[in-house]
């Protein structure tokens, strides 16, 4: 299969690689149907992610169809359309049990996909801890609609959630890129008194003005 691969600092390359196989009873193999590029992928390319392993397939924002599951997987089955969580996590360590899955102590835990183990800029991906890392997509939701759930939208949701926003608050969001817009959308659900977005790109400013006229820039 074709896989977009981190070769070395400043270099990615499309390579031919073997299709992934089940390694653990809790794994699933997913056929990728749609993916996107995260800024973190660019951070890897530019050498800002020291844990990134040369030779790894990059990518951690994707949706797909389950092709195969390990014997211990119970929440999904072959044929299911699924989102893939950016964080793989065991669900059992101290951090997982307290909700901080990004700090999972398992060797395949935390931000592993597309950084320390092969990610989703490929035709297929192996997802460890599939019961925690995969979520079925309803038939009424398209791949395009579900794509951001696993990372960029979840990042915006988490930011809005931990900020404990009230209806009396003024909220400042720095940046109106994809993550900033997702954060804006999730912040709007909290109905604060005022939302301010700080952005220097004229194109992004125009986008916010066009789609979110009540937001201050």
Question: Where are each of the predicted segments found?
Answer:
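Glycine-rich beta-strand-centered segment in the early N-terminal region that forms part
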Residues: 20-35, 48-97, 138-141
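Residues that mark the start of a beta-strand
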Residues: 2, 27-29, 170, 194
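Cytochrome P450 core scaffold surrounding the K-helix E-X-X-R motif
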Residues: 40-46
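Mid-domain Rossmann-like dinucleotide-binding core that forms the NAD(H)/NADP(H) cofactor-binding site
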Residues: 136-217
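Cysteine-cluster motifs in flexible loop/terminal segments that predominantly coordinate metals
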Residues: 38, 75, 86-135, 139
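Short Gly/Pro-enriched turn/cap motifs at secondary-structure boundaries
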Residues: 7, 19-20, 53-59, 113-118, ...
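Extracellular beta-rich ligand/substrate-recognition surface
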Residues: 5-12
